[in-house]
Structures are given as C-alpha cells and as structure tokens.
C-alpha cells in the first residue's frame, strides 16, 4: 500500500473518531474543499454501473506520490485539527477566515486528481474527492437525525459543563430547539439558528408537541360537581352564601323532617328550598333587623321597630306630636295614624347615604349590601354647647376650673343665696357678680404675708389690730431685741414717738451690737498699732472709734482700684508639724506573732487589750461598746422650748421676744 493511501486512511479514521465524539453533525473541514461545479451532481457516482466502484481504487494505485509527502501530510492533519478547534472556539467568523487562508502545507495535499474516463458513461465528468463527498453528504445525514437523539446530545453537552450547564439547560426549556439546531449544523449562524427555532415552534409549538393527542374515551354519566360555595336568597330577599343546606336535589336523606317549617331564629334556608319541595310557600317571619326612614330621609335601623304599631298597645300617647331632639320615628307613621304629614323640625345636620337596595348605581363590588357613601353636612353656625371645663376667677384673683357653680343664665334652680358672700373659701366667679349686678365682696385672706423692718418675709396667721384680732394689742408698739415677727403694717396704729423709738432701737445691718468696756485707741496707749487694719476674727472696735483714729472717709474699700491686693497668685504655704503617734509604744505582745511587725496589722487596738488585759501600756484603750454609756444621764433642759431668746427658769411668763417659759 502506498503512502498516500495510508495517509488518506489515517485522515478518514481521525475524521470518524471526531464524528463519534462530536456527533454526526460534525463536518470534517480539516482542509478547504475545492469549489464544486454547479452542474455536477453529488449523487452521480453512486448511480454508475457495477465496475464503477472499483475505479477509484485503480486511480489511487496509479497516482504516484513522492516519499517526502508523508511528514507534510501528518503535519497538515495536525494543523487542520488545530484550525477546527480554533473555529469552534471563535465561531463562524474565524472559520471563514481559516477557509479563506489555508495552511501552505495543506495546499500541497489538496491537488485534484486526474479524472479517469469511464467507457460506459456518456459524459465524462470529473469525480469529486472522497473528502468532498463526505463533506457534502454529512449535513444531509445530520438533518435526518431524530429530535430525541439531538436532545440527548444537547443534554450530555450541557452536563459536561458541570452544574452551571445543567441549570442553563433546565432554564431554557425542555425543547432546546437552539441546541439541537447548533448540533445539527455547527457552522450555522445565530440568525439561521433563530430561523430554525421559529420554524419549529410554528410547526410543533413551544412545547414541541406533534399535534396529535392520544384518543381518550369519554366518561359516561359525567356530571358536574356541586359548588363549594353557593349563593341563594331567603324569603326576605337577603343573600346567603356558603355551603347550601336543605334537601337540595333529593340527594340527602334524613332532612325531610321540618323541611317546610319556618324557624324563629335567623333565616338561613333559600327560597328555592320551599318552591321545589313544598306545596305552599310560607309567609316569612318578621325581620330581625328593620330599617325605616324619617321625614328627612335618614335611615334608622335596629332590632326593635319604634313607633306606633297595630301589634303593640300602650304607645298611642304622643303619636302625632313632634319631638325636638333626634328624629327616629318613621315617616309613614303620621300618614297612617294622624292623616297628615307633620312639619319638619329645624335641621341641625343631615347625612346622605346610598341605600343598600340600589342596584344600578351601586359602587360596591362583591355582592355585599354595604353602604358605599356616607357624607355628613353640618350648618355653618351650629348651636354652641356649654363647656364641660371652664376657667373662672374669684374676687381674690385665684383661678378656678371645672364645672361652674352659681347663678348663670343657662342654669336654673340656683337662685337661692346666689348674690350673698361666703365666709369660707371663695369659689364664686366674676360672672356671678355680673349677673347679680353688684361688686364682688372680698373675703379675708386665709394665709397672709407681710414684711418685717429687717426685710424678712413673714407668712401665716397674723395677730394685731390691723388684722381684726382683739386681745393682742399689748406690746404691739414696743421694740423687741429678738427675732421680729410683726409686720410693718402694724406700725400705723402706733404714735410717732413710738415709731421713732422703735427705729432707734431696731438693729440695723448684720453686725452684732457690742456692749461693755470697749477697748480701743482712745485713752489707751499702745493700742494704735493695727487700729486701721482689718482683722480676720470678731470685730471688737466700733465704727466711731475707727473713724476718729483712721481717715475712713478716704480709705479704700474692697473692690476699688486703690484697695491693696495680692500681687502673686501663688497658694499660701502652711507649715505642718510632724505627726506624733497618739499611743506610745508599749511592750510587745507575746504569743503567736502578735507584734508590731510589718506583716501583721490591727493588733494594737481594743482586740489586743481584750486578749491580754494585763499588758495595756501607758495609755491603753478601753473597748468600744454601748454599755460604757449606760451610767451617763442626759442633761435635763430648763425648758422643753428651744430656739427662743430669753429662755430662763425665772422671770415673766411671756417676753417681748416671743420666747415663753413652760
């Protein structure tokens, strides 16, 4: 066998393996095929006579190939495989470019063989190469593959990509028309694939159904199932929805007892129950909830019908009389029993509601009879109701809130004692005095406040002629040396001399008075030193003495610019003495290390003295305890009243300072 035959067999084996791996739709395009003639049919060599199939083998034996073509052919096969993989990776554009510019070594192999003229054929046509015939036939075979096989190939291809490929395969649908079209013709463009998918969907639908359905036998006696939720109307015309109860179509037994009887409670049977199963349709019971309309069109609903009725006696009184409050009687009552329509009362407000019985203009969907609109109109100037909580002011200016008491224009029955003053807490407002046309009587203050001569505020019950209290005039105009509790308003009942004396004897300022022998620079030698300097303790020098010795008129006061001030802002340093121990060191405690060592603390106190009472030291401490203070008695005071000046065991019972001896 020649080298060319071996190489062509090897190329055919490689192409066959590639077709098995990638499907029958794979096209062996390792080398660009030579252009065909349009008139040359592909199937012409197949129709030839019997000796025709052996003709190509003779032509291969006759053709001589140089020995140097074997490595070039193997390299061309590898290059063709690389080009094919590159085409599948890049798409159609790279495939077209690869076909346009084939490898130089591949061109050497693509030299057309010389045709052999057959004697039995009328026309000698140039036979095509084996690769060309294989290229032209394979797309036809691939197009004839069943859709199930292409579907399986597409699924295996997606499964080879992993989980992501499987999810993409499932999300794209079960038909996978695009994947099958790509497997059938790998060189097809996206436009051609889309056209094939649309054509397949037009022919078979999106679910790839063939259009033929399996014959199904029609069920015998097929009847509709009863409705789960039914709707009917009672004898009163009310809608009832839900599971229908009753005899129905004679499918339920045991419900014949009381089928044509009425119930006294809520009506739940439909009107068709009586029309189908009963000979006579009963009269419905009175409605549980009734609705009536007033003369102004307002709807009144409730379980009890108000007004006069033929079945109710005892309510004839006031049938034809009008009411001033809310109108609740029906409009037809006056026509039935009075023979005339009563006059409409003055409207203070009215509402417009759509009725439940309106069918044509009902705005509510779903079949429920609920109101669809509720609008309330109120007049512009409604009658003002009295305030529940109203503020007012008494004669003393105190504010009171709450329900107003007393005589008012809108309150009747409170005339007795309305214009009289009360002696207790004043709660009557100014509007009551206005109604009585008289000034308000001011009552006495329950708690008074006044000021003393020293500027202090005193509150509470006051005594004296000013406050209308008798028996407390003694000592009102006397000057006291203790705490002042009498207000300045009491001075107007004293004479001028008594007032002047009170002013002279009244202590002024916060400096205490100094009595006795006053030391000072007057008549005492050696006392001038430091007489004009400030002291930090108690003042013992009077102001007149200081003015006589020192020039106090020109002296600088604290806060002035020439007042001496400390230049440095450093804190004053204080000398501290060395701290001495309060308890002298005694003898050490014998025993288990109870000494004044560095490792044991707290053994020099009363606990150590209790353990060893014979060794107490120079100034031993006695143990603390409440039992030591038992023999000590508290000092009995002279009087149980404290905090007052002049508290002595002898003297008058009552002093001017306010202190009393019990």
Swiss-Prot record:
Which Pfam family name is an example for this entry? CsoS2_M
Region span, Middle region:
228-559
Cellular component annotations (GO), alphabetically ordered = carboxysome
- Tell me the segments the record calls region C-terminal domain: 560-631
Going by the UniProt record, its keywords in alphabetical order are: Bacterial microcompartment, Carbon dioxide fixation, Carboxysome, Repeat
Chain positions of N-repeat repeats: 8-27, 58-72, 147-168
Q: Which residues form a coiled coil?
A: none
Induction: what does the entry report? Induced by growth in low levels of dissolved inorganic carbon (at protein level).
Where on the tree of life does the source sit, at the highest rank? Bacteria
M-repeat repeat ranges?
228-278, 288-338, 388-436, 446-491, 496-550
Signal peptide location? none
The family assignment reads:
Belongs to the CsoS2 family.
Quote the protein name from its UniProt record. Carboxysome assembly protein CsoS2
């Amino acid at each position: 066998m020649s080298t060319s035959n071996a190489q062509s067999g090897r190329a055919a084996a490689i192409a066959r393996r590639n077709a098995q791996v990638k499907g029958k739709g794979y096209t062996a395009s390792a080398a660009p095929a030579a252009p065909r003639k349009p008139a040359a049919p592909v199937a012409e060599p197949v129709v030839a006579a019997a000796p025709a199939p052996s003709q190509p083998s003779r032509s291969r034996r006759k053709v001589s190939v140089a020995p140097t073509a074997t490595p070039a052919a193997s390299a061309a096969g590898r290059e063709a495989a690389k080009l094919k993989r590159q085409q599948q990776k890049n798409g159609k554009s790279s495939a077209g470019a690869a076909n346009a510019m084939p490898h130089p070594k591949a061109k050497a192999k693509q030299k057309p063989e010389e045709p052999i003229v057959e004697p039995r054929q009328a026309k000698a046509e140039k036979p095509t190469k084996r690769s060309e015939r294989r290229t032209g036939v394979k797309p036809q075979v691939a197009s004839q593959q069943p859709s199930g096989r292409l579907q399986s190939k597409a699924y295996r291809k997606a499964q080879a990509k992993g989980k992501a490929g499987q999810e993409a395969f499932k999300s794209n649908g079960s038909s996978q028309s695009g994947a099958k079209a790509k497997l059938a013709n790998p060189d097809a463009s996206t436009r051609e694939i889309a056209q094939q998918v649309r054509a397949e969907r037009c022919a078979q639908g999106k679910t790839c159904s063939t259009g033929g359905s399996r014959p199904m036998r029609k069920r015998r006696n097929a009847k509709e199932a009863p409705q789960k939720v039914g709707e009917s109307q009672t004898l009163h015309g009310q809608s009832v929805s839900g599971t229908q109860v009753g005899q129905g179509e004679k499918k339920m037994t045991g419900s014949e007892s009381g089928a044509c009887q009425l119930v006294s409670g809520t009506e739940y049977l439909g009107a068709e129950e009586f029309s189908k199963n009963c000979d006579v349709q009963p009269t419905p019971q009175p409605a549980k909830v009734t609705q009536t309309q007033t003369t102004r069109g307002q709807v009144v609903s409730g379980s009890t019908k108000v007004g006069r009725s033929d079945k109710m006696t005892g309510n004839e009184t006031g049938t034809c009389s009008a009411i001033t409050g809310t109108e609740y009687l029906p409009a037809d009552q006056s026509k039935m029993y009075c023979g005339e329509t009563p006059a409409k009362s003055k409207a203070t407000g009215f509402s417009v509601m759509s009725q439940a019985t309106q069918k044509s203009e009902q705005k509510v969907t779903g079949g429920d009879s609920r109101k669809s609109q509720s609008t309330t109109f109120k007049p512009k100037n409604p009658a003002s109701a009295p305030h529940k909580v109203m503020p007012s002011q008494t004669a003393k200016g105190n504010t009171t809130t709450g329900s107003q008491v007393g005589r008012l224009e809108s309150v009747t029955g409170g005339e007795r004692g309305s214009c009289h003053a009360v002696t207790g807490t004043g709660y009557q407002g100014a509007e009551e005095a206005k109604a009585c046309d008289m000034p308000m009587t001011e009552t006495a203050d329950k708690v008074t406040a006044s000021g003393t001569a020293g500027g202090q505020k005193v509150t509470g019950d006051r005594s004296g002629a000013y406050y209308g209290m008798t028996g407390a005039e003694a000592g009102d105009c006397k000057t006291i040396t203790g705490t002042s509790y009498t207000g300045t308003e009491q001075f107007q009942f004293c004479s001028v001399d008594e007032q002047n004396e009170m002013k002279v004897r009244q202590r002024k300022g916060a400096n205490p008075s100094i009595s006795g022998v006053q030391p000072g620079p007057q008549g005492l030698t050696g006392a001038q030193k430091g007489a004009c300097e400030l002291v930090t303790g108690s003042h013992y020098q009077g102001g007149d003495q200081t003015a006589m010795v020192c020039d106090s008129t020109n002296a600088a006061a604290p806060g002035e610019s020439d007042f001496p001030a400390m230049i440095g802002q450093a804190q004053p340093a204080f000398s501290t003495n060395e701290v001495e121990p309060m308890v002298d060191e005694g003898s050490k405690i014998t025993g288990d290390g109870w000494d004044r060592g560095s490792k044991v603390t707290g053994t020099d106190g009363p606990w150590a003295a209790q353990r060893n009472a014979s060794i107490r030291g120079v100034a031993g401490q006695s143990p603390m305890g409440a039992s030591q203070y038992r023999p000590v008695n508290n000092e009995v005071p002279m009087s149980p009243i404290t905090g007052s000046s002049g508290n002595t065991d002898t003297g008058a019972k009552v002093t001017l300072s306010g202190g009393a001896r019990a």
